[in-house]
């Protein structure tokens, strides 16, 4: 048994040995025949380079590197379809392979775009947004997911002081009655029962009206008196600055007199004249001067 270089085994019994010393020519003829048959079979199946496949790494990277990569990928897909071993790539219209010169869209869809994967037309992907009628999905229209409408806040009601239902109306006093009541109040602020009865009958008023008017007039007089006392206290406070160097001396003491004299002498002497502080008369105020707040009136 003899082994051929192309891997074809030929038995001696199959081809036979020719007579007359021709044993070396028969195996060489069989090897040539087998090589020719293998070449025919390989020619019937054309080899496709893996780099020309539209989904290979080289084809995907070439789309971003070279501007004419899409034309080369289309040509590769045409040759693959002619061989019958590949399917139509995604994102390429069915009639674009047969007519490469036909006018195409300004921007064809890519292999991994939304339109290429879902095979949707371009007009379905681009929707005209109308500001007047915005489109809302069903889950947004449901009350479960949509926010509640804004509540209009009503203006706060005016809260007035509520009077009693059985409150008596206010008594409108005349000018003559008011003058008589004021004159009587200056004479005597508290009236006895007999005086109140006699005075109310003379003014054509009830005793209760006269009694309430005198109560209100006494409260008003008390408020006015307190305000006058406060004004007198504010006016009685001395308007003097605190003592120099944080020292306080009672006015009228020898230390205060010496300090005032030294301040006046210091202000009058020296090349630069300084205005001396006015010295209050000794003995006018006997209050102890210190760090305190002085109110201006």
Swiss-Prot record:
There is a cross-link at residues 9, 127 (Glycyl lysine isopeptide (Lys-Gly) (interchain with G-Cter in SUMO)). The keyword Metal-binding does not apply. PROSITE patterns: HOMEOBOX_1, HOMEOBOX_2. GO terms for cellular component: nuclear periphery. Sumoylated by PIAS1, desumoylated by SENP1. Sumoylation of Lys-9 and Lys-127 not required for interaction with H1-5, transcriptional repression, inhibition of myoblast differentiation, or binding to gene promoters. It is found in: Nucleus. Residues 166-225 bind DNA. GO terms for biological process: embryonic morphogenesis; inner ear development; negative regulation of gene expression; negative regulation of odontoblast differentiation; nose development; positive regulation of cell cycle; positive regulation of odontogenesis; regulation of odontogenesis. InterPro entries: HD (IPR001356), HD_metazoa (IPR020479), Homeobox_CS (IPR017970), Homeodomain-like_sf (IPR009057), Msh_Homeobox_Regulators (IPR050674). GO terms for molecular function: DNA-binding transcription factor activity, RNA polymerase II-specific; RNA polymerase II transcription regulatory region sequence-specific DNA binding; transcription cis-regulatory region binding. Residues 25-38, 70-83 have a biased composition (Low complexity). Interacts with CREBBP/CBP, TBP and SP1; interaction with these transcription activators may inhibit autoinactivation. Interacts (via C-terminus) with PIAS1 (via N-terminus); the interaction is required for the localization of both proteins to the nuclear periphery and specific binding of MSX1 to the core enhancer region in target gene promoters. Interacts with H1-5. Belongs to the Msh homeobox family. This is Homeobox protein MSX-1. The gene is MSX1.
